[in-house]
């Protein structure tokens, strides 16, 4: 396909126009008095949202050069969302301000490389200053405040605070759609995993389509179970004990599965077979976790434990097991608190030593399952459109709360960024030339989020920025009440991680755009065809 090429200022200006279009669409949502954006969907009704990354993802511009700029700023929003789960609008507004001021300086003759270097150094200095000034978060009230600011909804803030408090810092908080109008919290104490029963005949509660086992024994097997002679001796012992049985194995098939099904239909033995989740080493590790939670052993021929020879002593136990077609939850396993604490310690040390992000994430999931249980926030609303919007807000609030627990909180309302200028001024004294100019560009951009929070609240942004820059740390402009004062005690706080991610990602993308000298895009198809039609045999 033929390409079009633009150079120098023309390329940068076109990209800036794209940055502006995307950022202008996103920044109207900033702050407690920000507005909504309506997105047309190719199927279903329109989506109403005030989430920066959701809006950014929908935007593709017609002009290919402008679209390059828009896509680069979109990456700021998505990267910030991936790292911190919130703060996407702040990141977009910062990037726009940096690009605008930076390009002005480049057009006036500044060296873009030195300018970009100054911006990066300033971003690092502000990031460190934010971390240093962050207040740790450990109580329910502070978590609820962060979640309330993120979702603009006190009820959501309370629910997220309660969920995080109940499952602990290592627990899992998920968000699901509720079938009612109510938004409420469900906490599952215990270990859950995403594998359901192997046969619908195991269902004991036909209304909810679940198999519920009370006071159950748990058999954990590393390999497949298919031979009936291997399984039968143990089944007979379990039947004598008169307790229901949960079997978790690589797979249960053939005679073994059909025998369990027949027993379930005849109600002679209540048993449920479930596949162990994951593959390879992760599955082995997870089965070992389950053994510790239930107080049992994993039946494994490699260590001399054969299924046909073992008795009830290798089985774990649980007060309650609930299995549906997609998931299994083991509540109140029979394992000792000491054994579980040791296992948690072991997984934490593995998390610290692993180099792979993927491994770290999976280890954290295992840790959460062991340590805290699972909290589910069920979101309800009157209409489908409202439900989507609320669910998004709750997901952002959960992400913000987790980020706050990780790195602490800073003053909200854009005040922390305006007041972080002192860190930038210190740095400016150490630099000279265009690098120092880059620091100035960054310092001026730091007021952009506060400017737009104030503007969206109907005030003069510049006046508010000047006033906040004179206030002591911890104070700022509360756009919800339109008053200046102590933001921390008023609960207007942001997670340090969210604000830091916004600063670093915005600086990174602004630097890329400032140092761009050439833009190459595909030639529009109709021009191509037009060209081919009239110039047969000519090279393009």
Swiss-Prot record:
Top-level class of the enzyme under EC nomenclature: isomerase
Main location: cytoplasm
CDD domains, per the entry: GroEL
Catalytic activity: ATP + H2O + a folded polypeptide = ADP + phosphate + an unfolded polypeptide
Binding of ATP, residues: 29-32, 86-90, 413, 478-480, 494
Binding partners and assembly: Forms a cylinder of 14 subunits composed of two heptameric rings stacked back-to-back. Interacts with the co-chaperonin GroES.
Protein name (database record): Chaperonin GroEL 1
This protein's encoding gene: groEL1
